[in-house]
């Protein structure tokens, strides 16, 4: 029996990154030998065991053979005669097909070290094309390591295109698509994930609402980048700089979906695109089974981001109504989330990356003023039932009006 550290732990250590999870491959052993040694079996479809002390995963070396459609259609073979090289060959990328023995020596049968050095994401073998989930995984790796200068090898991108055009991605379940997307949204450069999907044709298949934005022009006066798809990825990049929250990043990604519905004869204007985009947000989220909390914020951002841009021109009643509409009294975090997504929208434009966004500050300040109006004082004043709500709203509007006159005057 020989045990090797494999995959991401080896890769990230060589890149000088922190290692979170460690996976091990056991060569020359059987399930019974692992159980006799105190390991606990957890894999149903293939033999994976938990170490009795560390609880890290130890998998018997195995090979996989395509036996059906999609990413689950594989037959696994694990036996003592499966070599380390056999096991590493079934992995997706050469940089993930590295192993380290107990002496610290790196085993590299597929030139993963060379690709690490050259910052290349390259598939190990043609078997890559048998698993459609790998298209998303490579896009996610491209986003995760973009800041280190990694790019996808030409032949791997070609294979990803072939898989997409062959209809392989249609076998992916919504849950797996969302899981990979959610993980990509946590990376430093989530926009790279969607750009890679577009480069291989997968964006049109998995995210048609986003793909439809490319080639749709916006007024050059407001959008020097002109293309709405490019603007969308720029805003996502900016959102990633402003917030680590997946819901903020996803909402920013979806903020302009309504522009994809504008008839070409009305281009480059997109009047009413915000409310129009709400249905597309709902459609996308329902299809991918996006969690409700993330979906709800994306709907609100699509509907209200343009309104927040005009904050100095809003009257106090409209401002308080905005807080009502986003349910800020019960979910106050939404004020900050809308401020961040709206700022990402403004700064996600060519030449505006460092622009100030005072509307965000005013939105936050206006909220502090509105929510500081005490409910208790209204009740003590003798108001009852629906009168409490009406009087509370009236006092909030008055407080916001007083604040706005001093801090956020309406422009001439």
Curated annotation (Swiss-Prot):
GO BP term (any one): RNA repair
Function field: Catalyzes the addition and repair of the essential 3'-terminal CCA sequence in tRNAs without using a nucleic acid template. Adds these three nucleotides in the order of C, C, and A to the tRNA nucleotide-73, using CTP and ATP as substrates and producing inorganic pyrophosphate. tRNA 3'-terminal CCA addition is required both for tRNA processing and repair. Also involved in tRNA surveillance by mediating tandem CCA addition to generate a CCACCA at the 3' terminus of unstable tRNAs. While stable tRNAs receive only 3'-terminal CCA, unstable tRNAs are marked with CCACCA and rapidly degraded.
Cofactor binding notes: Magnesium is required for nucleotidyltransferase activity. Nickel for phosphatase activity.
NCBIfam families (UniProt xref): PRK10885.1 (NF008137)
HAMAP family: CCA_bact_type1, CCA_bact_type2
Pfam name, any one: HD
The organism's taxonomic lineage, starting at the top: Bacteria, Pseudomonadati, Pseudomonadota, Gammaproteobacteria, Enterobacterales
Residues holding CTP: 8, 11, 91, 137, 140
Note: A single active site specifically recognizes both ATP and CTP and is responsible for their addition.
UniProt GO molecular function: ATP binding; CCA tRNA nucleotidyltransferase activity; cyclic-nucleotide phosphodiesterase activity; magnesium ion binding; phosphatase activity; tRNA binding
Full protein name: Multifunctional CCA protein
Gene field: cca
Domain HD: 228-329
